[in-house]
Swiss-Prot record:
Keyword match Cell membrane: no
Record-given protein name: Probable Fe(2+)-trafficking protein
Lineage, opening ranks: Bacteria, Pseudomonadati, Pseudomonadota, Gammaproteobacteria, Aeromonadales
Record-linked PANTHER family: FE(2+)-TRAFFICKING PROTEIN-RELATED (PTHR36965:SF1)
GO annotation, biological process: cellular response to oxidative stress
Family annotation (InterPro entries): Fe_traffick_prot_YggX, Fe_traffick_prot_YggX_sf
Presence of the UniProt keyword Translocase in the record: no
Family, per entry: Belongs to the Fe(2+)-trafficking protein family.
Function: Could be a mediator in iron transactions between iron acquisition and iron-requiring processes, such as synthesis and/or repair of Fe-S clusters in biosynthetic enzymes.
Alphabetized UniProt keyword annotations: Iron
Amino acid sequence: MSRTVFCQRLKKEGPGLDFQLYPGELGKRIFDNISKEAWTEWQKKQVMLINEKKLNMMNLEHRQLLEKEMVSYLFEAGEVAIDGYTPPSQ
């Protein structure tokens, strides 16, 4: 049986992640407070962000930028701004 969490991003109960996907205290916070649905949404945004901004994950500054965007998106209800992208609903 999967575990249930109250997702801070979606503000509703949902299935939690199966295991901690990110290291450290932030990873624990994500595991305890973010649902699979919200994590999947973040992964899509993350791929777009990496591609559009041409981020190199070997570069510490780029990883820090991505982590900052992740925290904003998952916990502060921030949206990922991607230049030139218009969501399908608009």
